[in-house]
Regions:
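Conserved beta-strand-loop-alpha-helix junction that forms the acyl-donor binding cleft
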Residues: 111-120, 143-153, 168-174, 179-180
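Conserved GNAT-fold acetyl-CoA-binding loop/helix
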Residues: 23-45, 56, 89-91
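Conserved beta-strand in the GNAT
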Residues: 59, 65-74, 109, 114
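A short beta-loop-alpha structural element at the N-terminal edge
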Residues: 1-15, 23-27
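Conserved acyl-donor/pantetheine-binding loop and adjacent beta-alpha core of acyl/acetyltransferases
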Residues: 74-112
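A short helix-loop-beta-strand connector motif used in the catalytic cores of GNAT acetyltransferases and
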Residues: 45-59, 76-81, 109
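Conserved acetyl-CoA-binding loop-helix of GNAT-fold acetyltransferases
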Residues: 115-117, 121-134, 154-158
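Conserved GNAT acetyl-CoA-binding A-motif
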Residues: 106-108, 129, 135-147
Length: 180
């Protein structure tokens, strides 16, 4: 079953989010500490009005276990959503940081799509994408895919996403794919 996340999903969703964006989280908190990175994501997940909030998250649940998650939001809201993250980093870790904008007005942006390693390849990622496409029927959906993740890129292409351009994020190049 696919449903909107709740704050109580944080312990299950944060590790999935980290799996999809570990290098970016390490840069944000300026530590290569897996447990601290997951704590960082959990704290943001339970809050409202930020990129990583439960408000922006769909979960795939089976037998009361969360097996996948998809975080998305309207690209027009990237500035206030990311500012909340940067403010949290300043308050929690004491440093200022800014990353390149990963999206913009005119698209709904998939920030992370992640499936538990034990059930990858079983259609969960595809199900989450299909659900989002149905929710956002008629809207443009964008995402960034790492140059080192051809498996994910193939999934997105099978789901109808096409290459739009290249973007930099946290100092690394990503392919910007869109679905219209």
């Amino acid at each position: 079953m696919i449903r909107t996340a709740t704050p109580s999903d944080a312990p299950f969703v944060a590790p999935l989010m980290f799996q999809a964006m570990s290098e970016i989280v390490f840069k944000l908190i300026q530590q290569e500490d897996i447990q601290e990175s997951i704590r960082f994501l959990e704290k943001l997940f339970i809050q409202e009005n930020n990129q990583y909030s439960y408000e922006n998250t769909l979960v795939y649940e089976k037998d009361k276990q969360i097996l996948g998650s998809l975080v998305y939001y309207n690209g027009a809201h990237i500035d206030p959503l990311s500012q909340s993250v940067f403010d949290f980093i300043k308050a929690s870790y004491g440093h200022d940081i800014r990353l390149e904008k990963e999206t913009q007005a005119g698209e709904y942006y998939i920030d992370t799509l992640s499936v538990s390693p034990k059930v990858q390849g079983k259609g969960i990622g595809s199900s989450l994408l299909l659900h989002l496409k149905e929710l956002l029927k008629g809207e443009t959906i964008g995402l960034l895919v790492s140059m080192d993740n051809p498996q994910a890129e193939k999934l997105y292409q099978r789901m109808g996403f096409v290459y739009a351009d290249m973007k930099m994020l946290a100092g690394a190049p990503y392919k910007h794919l869109i679905y219209q």
